[in-house]
Swiss-Prot record:
Annotated GO MF terms: protein domain specific binding; violaxanthin de-epoxidase activity
GO CC annotation terms, alphabetical: chloroplast; chloroplast thylakoid; chloroplast thylakoid membrane; cytosol; extracellular region; thylakoid lumen
Species of provenance: Arabidopsis thaliana
Highest taxon of source: Eukaryota
PANTHER family: VIOLAXANTHIN DE-EPOXIDASE, CHLOROPLASTIC (PTHR33970:SF1), VIOLAXANTHIN DE-EPOXIDASE, CHLOROPLASTIC-RELATED (PTHR33970)
Predominant place of localization: plastid
Protein name: Violaxanthin de-epoxidase, chloroplastic
Length: 462
């Protein structure tokens, strides 16, 4: 069971595009044209996927669906300053420009215009340092770019969580802490009642918390977002009479058929009045709280031993996520206990046949050459055809540049001109930490142009 952290940041869509040259096709959906000495940037709508599962399977929408969205999308034109103009900017203004462009490239295209402007304003006002660090960090920038592929999908939340799974690191955590918890730039997802607290009568009436001691595998899970990862081996030990500590680990599959391992420590306290309820509260990161409900268990020191846990939780970004898992001593779900599990699942209105069996063979990662061959084989058939057709669409849209109405990105670009008049106030507002960060990164004008003139690589993070 993975830690639920829906936020600004758990695999990422395999057909994101970047532009690496002035007239090229890129994976982020950004094209650049130089007209009368000024760079114009076009933001293309993100390609969306109909299905994204933790098993690593991908099912993308057909090209015709993408082309339809392409032709109907709004193409926003942003005049960028020239290199000479950039060189005249001071470091504080460069930092603010980075923030504006980050919003334009990575946040605004994915959301409603009004909400996006509110989010950008919040980030630029309250999370300048964290935003700048995120854009300068490949994993964090790739994570935000990955999120754009989730926009308006039926499984938008699940897709966002999978992005976080792939690109999680300390910079992402710091950005989330500011944007989600401290400054609340992201609205909290409300509880839709999908995972209600179960009636106490369906829980085990007696449970010795020490029975959780030792190593357990998750061999079956309800929620594909949190529960169905490979190689879920969790080791528990008790502290005192009613405290349980779990060292949990799971594997995240990557797009090239590889994987890397995530781990976390979770601490639970047993409810003194309901032995079948365990609470994991008082966590700093996103202030998440998980409640575990034990539906059924059998402890006989045999391979068929199991503990069936249903859970629900909340954090600063999402109230009401949940799922259910079956812990077994065996790495494979024993068939002999399935009737008991079916009965327990039915008690909370769930069908156990919909649960997903996990793969706990925990084998080695495929050789790099095998992963590359598989990735190339799966992608080369799509790339040639789509590049040709997308280039044709791009050229048609470029002809419409002169007739483009004022858009959100034009307003952002106009805001850049105001930055030049606001330098004195901006410098006065900078904190000591922000000034130290500016000195630390020593971001030159050419580096800013390079950062936003080329693609942010979405790559496997080790």
């Amino acid at each position: 069971m993975a830690v639920a952290t829906h936020c600004f940041t758990s695999p990422c869509h395999d057909r994101i595009r970047f532009f690496s040259s002035d007239d090229g096709i890129g994976r982020l959906g950004i094209t650049r044209k130089r007209i009368n000495g000024t760079f114009l940037l076009k933001i293309l709508p993100p390609i969306q996927s109909a299905d994204l599962r933790t098993t690593g399977g991908r099912s993308s929408r057909p090209l015709s669906a993408f082309r339809s969205g392409f032709s109907k999308g709004i193409f926003d034109i942003v005049p960028l300053p020239s290199k000479n103009e950039l060189k005249e900017l001071t470091a504080p203004l460069l930092l603010k420009l980075v923030g504006v462009l980050a919003c334009a490239f990575l946040i605004v295209p994915s959301a409603d215009a009004v909400d996006a402007l509110k989010t950008c304003a919040c980030l630029l006002k309250g999370c300048r340092i964290e935003l700048a660090k995120c854009i300068a960090n490949p994993a964090c920038a790739a994570n935000v770019a990955c999120l754009q592929t989730c926009n308006n999908r039926p499984d938008e939340t699940e897709c966002q969580i999978k992005c976080g799974d792939l690109f999680e690191n300390s910079v992402v955590d710091e950005f989330n802490e500011c944007a989600v918890s401290r400054k609340k730039c992201v609205p909290r997802k409300s509880d839709l009642g999908e995972f209600p607290a179960p009636d106490p009568s369906v829980l085990v009436q007696n449970f010795n918390i020490s029975d959780f001691n030792g190593k357990w595998y998750i061999t079956s899970g309800l929620n594909p977002t949190f529960d169905a990862f490979d190689c879920q081996l969790h080791e528990f030990h008790t502290e005192g009479d009613n405290k349980l500590v779990g060292n949990i680990s799971w594997r995240i599959k990557t797009l090239d058929s590889g994987f890397f391992t995530r781990s976390a420590v979770q601490k639970f306290v047993q409810d003194p009045n309901q032995p079948g309820v365990l609470y994991n509260h008082d966590n700093e990161y996103l202030h998440y709280q998980d409640d575990w409900y034990i539906l059924s268990s059998k402890i006989e020191n045999k391979p068929e031993d199991y503990i069936f846990v249903y859970y629900r939780g909340r954090n600063d970004a999402w109230d009401g996520y949940g799922g259910a898992v079956v812990y077994t001593r065996s790495s494979v779900l024993p068939n002999s206990i399935i009737p008991e599990l079916e009965k327990a699942a039915k008690s909370i209105g769930r069908d156990f046949s919909t649960f997903i069996r996990t793969d706990n063979t925990c084998g080695p990662e495929p050789a790099l050459v095998e992963r590359i061959e598989k990735t190339v084989e799966e992608g080369e058939r799509i790339i040639v055809k789509e590049v040709e057709e997308i280039e044709e669409e791009v050229e048609k849209e470029v002809e419409k540049v002169g007739r483009t109405e004022m858009t959100l990105f034009q307003r952002l670009a106009e805001g850049f001109n105001e930055l030049k008049q606001d330098e004195e106030n901006f410098v006065r507002e900078l904190s000591k930490e922000e000034m130290e960060f500016l000195d630390e990164i020593k971001m030159e004008a050419s580096e800013v142009e390079k950062l936003f003139g080329k693609a942010l690589p979405i790559r496997k993070v080790r």
